[in-house]
Structures are given as structure tokens and as C-alpha cells.
Amino acid sequence: MRLVILDDYALASEWAAKYICNCIIQFNPGPDKYFTLGLPTGSTPLGCYKKLIEYHKSGDLSFKYVKTFNMDEYVGLPRDHPESYHSYMWNNFFKHIDIDPNNAHILDGNASDLQAECEDFERKIKEAGGIELFVGGIGPDGHIAFNEPGSSLVSRTRLKTLAMDTILANAKYFDGDLSKVPTMALTVGVGTVMDAKEVMILITGAHKAFALYKAIEEGVNHMWTVSAFQQHPRTIFVCDEDATLELRVKTVKYFKGLMHVHNRLVDPLLSMKKN
């Protein structure tokens, strides 16, 4: 497990974007070999998406041979609703890059058969060869995707009831009106993300500090679903200083001492430009 600690949100976002960029380029995707990327929503990845858009617009990165699978989607919210995760992904990322819309997979929270929709999503991931890199964020209660506290750590894509903490946290996107916030969602399972060849989790802000502590300094616990990734062979937690406030001093010192190693993963930033 790697813990990459950057000074602030902007630097953490840039490091994560550089890492994604280098992973895609080193994979050398093509028409017969697509790179599969798992993606989150929420406020945390926005900075990372902005940097990836920059790399695309500068000609350093193409998403032509990338397939994406998003973590989750609300149930019952129209696809074109401004707060649906379809809208979020297209407005904040997809419409700014060269991805084929057919290769951007997002769960359909309005499907007539939600169970079949979840099973189909798992099948599509398998047919794509599995996820190369799954990027995620977490909530203050340590949930990843919508795998709320108490979720099975071997769970698959399924319908979930949202915890009140999550509904309250999401109310800001719905004019503070709890009655407008969806109470159900489709989400990949912890096991779905664990199956990825590599997982990168973005954690920023002091309000996520206790969750980061639970994620890496205590044992695996289904009440803090992000802790499951202690057992993944290739997990990277990318955080800012504020997110480390609950960690032991020696933990922070140990991982900061490895930054020269971590920075080799993103420096130099690779490019798809032809020389």
C-alpha cells in the first residue's frame, strides 16, 4: 500500500491526474487493447478531471482507446437531471475529451429491471478484461462508492439504500431540501473495486481525516468499507495534508520519507505527442 501525501488539494489532484495519464500511456492502448478505467463522482475528483482535460487538450493524452466504468448512479433521478451522475460526468469530464460515448459506462438508475442492470454492468466489466485502474473517493464515514457502513467487503454491483449521513451530505446539491435527495442508488460493490488490478483512492480535507485513519491505521472493518483496500495488492491513497490530521506522526513521517519514490511514478509526465 502506498500513501502519497501532498501539501494541498491542487497538488494532490495534479499528482493523481499525472498518475492516471502515465498509466494509460504506459499501457499503450489501441483498437485491439483498450485501457479500462473506473471513475468516481463527487467534489474530490473535480481537480483531477480538470488536469486530465488539460493533458488531453495539450495533446499529451487521448481517451480514444479508453473504456470507463463509473462507480454509481442515483435511482429514480432522470438521466438529464443536473445532479445525476450522468450529467456530472458529461459536464465535468467526458464532453471535454475524445472518449467514444459508447465506451463510457454509467449505471442506469431508471432501468426497468435494476437487478438485471447491475448484473449487466458486472458482465461488461468482465468482457472489457477487468478494470486496470479504479479511481475512487470516500465519504467522511469511510464509504467507497455507495458501499455504506456495514456493507459486505465482497459485495458486487447492486441496489443500495443510502445512509442518512450520505443523504445529509448530498442535500447541498439539492438546494438543501432532503425531500429531493434520492434515497437509493446503484453502486459497484467493494468486491467489484477490489477486483481491479490497481486502486487509487483520493482523500482530501480535514473532514475526511478520521476516515483516512480508519482506512490505514486500524484493521479491516466492514463499518469502514475503505479499510478493505489494505488487502489489495496495489492500492494508492492520495491525500493532502489536512486529510492526515488524525494519523500518527510516525505514519506521516514514514510515508513522506517515501515521496521521492512516489514522485518517480509521475515524473516525468509521459506524452502521446509524436516527436
Curated annotation (Swiss-Prot):
One Pfam entry name: Glucosamine_iso
GO biological process: carbohydrate metabolic process; glucosamine catabolic process; N-acetylglucosamine catabolic process; N-acetylneuraminate catabolic process
Protein task: Catalyzes the reversible conversion of alpha-D-glucosamine 6-phosphate (GlcN-6P) into beta-D-fructose 6-phosphate (Fru-6P) and ammonium ion, a regulatory reaction step in de novo uridine diphosphate-N-acetyl-alpha-D-glucosamine (UDP-GlcNAc) biosynthesis via hexosamine pathway.
InterPro entries, A to Z: Glc/Gal-6P_isomerase (IPR006148), Glucosamine6P_isomerase (IPR004547), Glucosamine6P_isomerase_CS (IPR018321), NagB/RpiA_transferase-like (IPR037171)
Primary location: cytoplasm
Catalytic activity as recorded in UniProt: alpha-D-glucosamine 6-phosphate + H2O = beta-D-fructose 6-phosphate + NH4(+)
Name of protein: Glucosamine-6-phosphate deaminase 2
S-S bonds: none
UniProt GO molecular function: glucosamine-6-phosphate deaminase activity; identical protein binding
PANTHER family per record: GLUCOSAMINE-6-PHOSPHATE ISOMERASE (PTHR11280), GLUCOSAMINE-6-PHOSPHATE ISOMERASE 2 (PTHR11280:SF9)
Coiled coil: 102-131
Enzyme class, broadest EC rank: hydrolase
Keywords: Carbohydrate metabolism, Coiled coil, Cytoplasm, Hydrolase
